[in-house]
Amino acid sequence: MMKHLLSIFFIGALLLGNIKTSEGSLSSALETTPGSLLSDLWLDRFPDPFKILERIPLGLERDTSVALSPARVDWKETAEGHEIMLDIPGLKKDEVKIEVEENGVLRVSGERKREEEKKGDQWHRVERSYGKFWRQFKLPDNVDMESVKAKLENGVLTINLTKLSPEKVKGPRVVNIAAEEDQTAKISSSESKEL
């Protein structure tokens, strides 16, 4: 059943992309840029498997009473650094935690708690999301991990990270491989020292 629905969806998308209107192709409606209709529909139904690690921590205990809701994120790189913006409306700064790990991972977590229900209250609609959220990002090597600054304003958490100068960026460490005779020579020389 799911295969048939996906086939119909893709055939329809291909047909729509080839139909011309007075303004050009309808393929602009099929764009997958963030915020486009197709992108939102696609991401709601089929999340990017490579982004799952950014949203759900491996060690997170599952609490069935509280849903995990992701915070929407924008991340831009400028000449001076990186700026990460998360939408977290209704949260105070003491309800949000920002962690930076030595391995270059930035983690933002928090919880939006549901309002306490009072006796006699009758809810007509509950649409706002509640629960824990968690986002984690693998930062590039050019980020100064000591430069992390954050501010929370109008429901948007903005995290600024400064770039390191090119000469301070640590590249991968090259490991020398010893030949077998080098190992034998080291062993025999260490044995002779012990005698």
Curated annotation (Swiss-Prot):
Assigned keywords, A-Z: Endoplasmic reticulum, Glycoprotein, Signal, Stress response
Cystine crosslinks: none
Signal peptide: 1-21
GO biological-process terms attached to the record: cellular response to hypoxia; response to heat
GO cellular component: endoplasmic reticulum
Quaternary structure annotation from Swiss-Prot or TrEMBL: May form oligomeric structures.
Protein name: 22.0 kDa heat shock protein
UniProt source species: Arabidopsis thaliana (Mouse-ear cress)
